[in-house]
Amino acid sequence: MDYTTDNPHKLGYRMPAEWENHAATWLSWPHQKEDWPGKFQPIPWVYAEIIRHIAAHEVVKLVIPSNEHKVKIRKILQASGVLLKNVQFFVARTNRSWIRDYGPIYITAEKGHKALLDFRFNAWAKY
């Protein structure tokens, strides 16, 4: 793997639009109740509904907190009618379900060249 500190834009790379063709959608399973104070109970079911709609058309790569959680998550997904053959599970420690803050950021250039950004999210400022 090559590593560079050069500006990706100057090298001809760009971040693809969300509507462009892609291999999969990455999501992270919600598990931090503090993100939804007093409202967490329906959140896993809401995520399952989102996954159901996406997995009907493409692969979902789902980050989960542990293999122990996988059994419960699969039950929720099954009960929601998710096409499980299109869901791939990846165990990784996370502190939030907002994968855009810490997940892989793919960029692309002409002629099919692809790269990953080493993006370091350092949390939200106070708002």
Task: Annotate the PLM regions.
Residues 1-127:
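The feature marks the mature, well-folded catalytic cores of soluble enzymes
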